Amino acid sequence: MLRHTRNKCLSIIPRRYLFVPSNSFTDSKKKNVIRAKPRVKSTPKIMEDEAHQKKPQIDKSLIAKAKKDLRELRSLAKDVSEYIEPKDIDSLTTTKKISTELPPIDIDEATEDIFQEISDSKGKMKKHPKALPPSLSFPEKINQRLGLVSDLLVSRESTSNLPEKTRNDKWNILLTQLNAAGGFKELSEVDIRSFVNKIPLRSLRNLIPFIENMYHEAGVSVHYNTYYSFIRALSLGASISDTQIQVIEGYFNEIEKQTELKMDHYETKIAVYVKNKNKKKIEEVLGVMKAKNLPLSKSIYKSILSSYVYYTKDHRRAIEVFDSMKFLSESTKPDAKVYAQIIISCMMNDDIDKGLDLLQEMRDNNVKPNQSILSALAKGCARSRQHKFQAWNHLFQIYEYGWTPTLQTFEHMLYISAKDGDVELTRALFYKMLETNSVTPSAFISLMLAYANYQSPTSRTEPFLVSLTENGRLFKQNIMANVDFSKPIHGFPFLPTSRIPDGKFILAESSAIWAYTIMHNPSFVNNPHVAAPYLNIAYELGEFNDFKDRLNESTYLNDEGIPKVREIEIIEPNEETESPDSELQVVEPNENDTGLVKSPILNKLSGHLKDNRHKAPRDSMIYQIALDAAGKFKKFDFAQEIIKERGQFRKSNMFKKLSSKEQTKQDFQFAEKLVYCYVKMNLIEDAYSVVLSSVDRFPWGWKQLVPLNTAAINLGSSELAAAVRKIAQSNQVKHHGKIKSNDYKKYVMKRGY
């Protein structure tokens, strides 16, 4: 900066300088300082020579022999384990051998492989090193007795994350080795309890008698925490038998001898009695807690709620318990799991609007929905004509949250596409399940349901639900592009094409799949819920011969509990005897049955199907489908056979086990189907006689009587139509389906307008 002055002096230019004080360390270069080493007393040369002479020489052959022995020992341990517990390989978990059962599937476990197949991910699963996890580190004395057997607990390297990995569970072999090496003898109770706590509950439930015997042989008393672990292991699963309840109650008595029951024990007790459907025991436990001034915890409320949702199926009570949890206290406010239970109850009882309101309530209360909620809403919406367009949107929200779809979610995808009649997408999704070794009975039912709901492109008037959004179209396009039906998986008989030409294609493929399932997975076809859509395929797409053939070869009358009255009947020698299992005679294929679409394998298996091992017992749903078929194909004699056999079915144990409310409900449904059957045959007087004979028992309304009223008008029977309308009007008033004029006037007077 320049500055001019009046006396014309030289210009002053200010500058800045940095003054650094002198330092001897900075002025001179650093020198490498050599540290002094401590003096070590030198060893005489004579002593070094002696040391070299004393050092032993290691034989390399001994090292090689030791390594060889170690490898042989490990191989022997694996061979022994495979000999003790042979593997059960089935047709849907390996390509080398086709067995007769599917892999065990746990619905609650996530399946990463399924998600990767859907999203066409090319990433590889992270491999775990073959070492015992820290969570399975045993006490030192137990490790000494186990030796190398503990390596059996490590799962083999696999690219699959499916529940089939539980087959490598070798805890029984490990306990056998421990028992042979001394068992629990001379071990502290703490070490024993630490070891038992390492066993997963699903494995522990089958090993409890063996462990108790080891305790007894060692003379060690079982700690109450170990008894509690036994109880938790036995309480796994959806239901608990009376025999298991007796064992569990015995363990609770042993716990009470050692300590006073705590809140955790009471919570488990109630959960156990809920799964046993024992209301009396639940009330007793609640009474004991009330006497001890123990408040009801959130876990107890959840157990009671689950009893109403899954066991007693009382939706009204479930709503009451849920509302109590909301307004009782801050500690009992519902979380995402509680919301999931009540929303599932809404979907099971077709209360879709209530379920959607609860979802909005969760978002208002900043409660993040979980995958179970969105999956249940998707399935529930698919069953509603009004809300079916929202089904796929709920499923796609799972991907928006970045969650990995569970096996249950994938099953719901199959159900939604099957309910919509999208056979191509359902076949592709089922093919993906075959690739990932995760086929379940629910998935098989959905496949049969898709076949039953198939409509040809010319007769279908609505687009598929998945095609209504851009995400849905891309989803279906990606799935179809990644499936090649020309490459069968495990020999599953999909026809080698992704396009469905006509109904004959559906009949042929479903028959081939049914034959394959009988040979490889017979447990699938023993369920009436599987047989019902299989029969509906023939009802919708086939002829009467197709339907009757499937009815006789896939279902049978379970005569347990039916009185053997027919045994005393006198039968002529030339007269053919009737089948003891069913009044419906098996239709043998002949030259006239040219239109029968049936797999040739089923004809070869007909001899094995006579013992009913590979058939489903007939229930009310099967008889209703049979009546529909009799009405559609106008087979009056067949309808009479169904009515007669349905009367026998009502005497069986299968029907008697139902509650009186459920029995009345099923009888009303059968009577309704019988009226429709007679109407289709133009037998309106017979249909009216069915209504008239049961008018005092069943709530006949316009919903059930409109077809009969319409048929009477079309046939010119005005008197019968008037009688039908009179029954409908009187039942509306009787069953509170219509308000009377006087009651309406009182209602308006109280309301004020």
From Swiss-Prot:
InterPro entries, alphabetized: Pentatricopeptide_rpt (IPR002885), PROP1-like_PPR_dom (IPR033443), TPR-like_helical_dom_sf (IPR011990)
Assigned GO CC terms: mitochondrion
A matching Pfam family: PPR_long
Species in which this protein is naturally found: Candida tropicalis (strain ATCC MYA-3404 / T1) (Yeast)
Gene3D superfamilies in the cross-refs: Tetratricopeptide repeat domain
Gene Ontology BP annotations: mRNA processing; RNA splicing
PANTHER family given in the database record: OS03G0856100 PROTEIN, OS12G0638900 PROTEIN
Other observations noted: Involved in mitochondrial-nuclear incompatibility, a major determinant in reproductive isolation between species, through hybrid incompatibility of Ccm1 and its interacting partner 15S rRNA between yeast species.
Full protein name: Mitochondrial 15S rRNA processing factor CCM1
Transit peptide (residue range): 1-76
Keyword Membrane appears in the UniProt entry: no
Compartment(s): Mitochondrion
Start-end of each PPR repeat: 262-296, 297-332, 335-369, 370-405, 406-441
Domain of life: Eukaryota
